[in-house]
Amino acid sequence: MMFLSFNMISGGNTLQRFDPVACVSSVPLLLAPTTRPTFHFPSPFLSKPKPTYLFTSFSSSSSSSSSFFSSTTPPRSTMLHHDPLVSDVYATAISGVVALSFLRLFQETAKRDLFDQKLNRKLVHISIGLIFMLCXPLFSTETWASFFAALIPGINIFRMLVIGLGILKDEATVKSMSRFGDYRELLKGPLYYAATITLAAIIYWRTSPISIAAICNLCAGDGMADIVGRRLGGEKIPYNKNKSFAGSIAMATAGFLTSIGYMWYFSSFGFIEGSWKLVLGFLLVSIVTAFVESLPISTELDDNLTVPLTSILVGSIIL
């Protein structure tokens, strides 16, 4: 193929033919570029980040039911302040105010006799521990955060001791937390209740499903067992006439559903990783705990002691 080129000769332009094949030893003046400039644009088809599902046993090609749950994200180091220590102080103050507000609320309902005393006591039983867990994401990811959180139920241990021993008189607290209005009752169930939540916060904290199982079965499970059992518990369990089938079923159901709710809640903050295996584990823990609660020995000891101990023991095996 022949090409035309212009060369500058003596200041003028001359038209000459140029044969690229014949020109071997010299570089041609006019030579089309052999390469084209390339431009790199990000393409969504070249690399795509893998989604992280709450239920990790399901892949992106699995059933669409897993997309109902939010993805697990890494937990934030602090939520209320850039300094973790200051953030945990704020979180402790907020959690304490929230817990105290609900305690005062139920003390007022007990004082005004808005509810039956037994119902009022169980409403306190159900709400306080679950509200405490709702505040857990406010705390930082530092190792000391669990001790800050444990201060809230830990203070209640001290309150139960001084009131139960008669050192301090608090009729509103006694009426809202005791069965028969005896201040010495606070040394049993209410004290075990506060101790369970305190130890669960320190030992297991929000990163362990065992803590979820223990608190949810203690609060929601045991609380609903009493409420439902008193109203629908006509048919008693053969081996324990003080317990009913309705109460035991309500306990297992409430403990299980609440555990699933808090599994999703803490998973959304990245503290634990939910899975269908964990769902099955929570179900088994709630069933076994409800069965132990229905035994006569649970009545002789205290539900606030046997329920969390069973949840922790069974949870340590299967969760």
Swiss-Prot record:
Swiss-Prot/TrEMBL keywords:
Chloroplast, Kinase, Membrane, Plastid, Transferase, Transit peptide, Transmembrane, Transmembrane helix
- What membrane topology is given? Multi-pass membrane protein
User: Has UniProt tagged this entry with the keyword NADP?
Assistant: no
| InterPro entries (UniProt xref) | Phytol/farnesol_kinase
Q: Name one GO cellular component term.
A: chloroplast membrane
Look up the transit peptide and give its residue range. Answer: 1-22
S-S bonds: none
Compartments annotated for it: namely: Plastid, Chloroplast membrane
Report which residue ranges the record marks as coiled coil.
none
- From the record, give the transmembrane residue ranges: 83-103, 123-143, 147-167, 185-205, 252-272, 278-298
Q: Which GO terms describe its biological process?
A: vitamin E biosynthetic process
Q: What is its EC number?
A: 2.7.1.182
Q: Which GO terms describe its molecular function?
A: kinase activity; phytol kinase activity
Q: Report the function annotation for this chain.
A: Involved in the activation and reutilization of phytol from chlorophyll degradation in plant metabolism, including tocopherol biosynthesis. Catalyzes the conversion of phytol to phytol monophosphate (PMP).
Family indicated by similarity = Belongs to the polyprenol kinase family.
Q: What is this protein called?
A: Probable phytol kinase 3, chloroplastic
Q: Which organism is it from?
A: Glycine max
* Lineage of origin: Eukaryota, Viridiplantae, Streptophyta, Embryophyta, Tracheophyta
